[in-house]
């Protein structure tokens, strides 16, 4: 993997907002564009459908600590920050400083004061706290080179009952392998750090949406629930 691709590894995930993909050639062209160009693409109204439904399913509450890993232009960061206000903190994590600057500016314009930007590393989100309630990966994990290492690193920042939430796409018939990520593989990486599927949500036709947790408290194994589309 080239250094240029590694430098964009988290930010590119946002190009596939909510399962709306691009053709292979276009995707590779977009990867070469500066941050300013694909911010415009990510902020298009047709790319933010179902954000509210996702936020509702997450059942965030005021005071929660949330990490939006691969935050991109802040499509999820802003509404999640609002959901956990006034005393919750949203950490927008990216490895592209220009994207983080954009999120900070966007938050200021919208009067959102509880977002903190974090410049992550290739194998570690580098969060400044270890009491995170939710680490949220929207179309991000499949873009990370060392996935097991990254989820290992992420887990150390979570509370004992913290959640790792993954939205991604299973194998597709065409396209490069980096465009998808089998849920079974994610299950395996999570199990290696004692995280298991706690909830599955049917929000998207072409994406899986799974919340992972450790067995916690008196529970021998977290109950798996299938949440149907309203």
Kindly label every feature range from the protein language model:
Residues 199-230:
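Core SAM-dependent methyltransferase catalytic element
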Residues 26-67, 73-75, 102-105:
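Class I SAM-dependent transferase core
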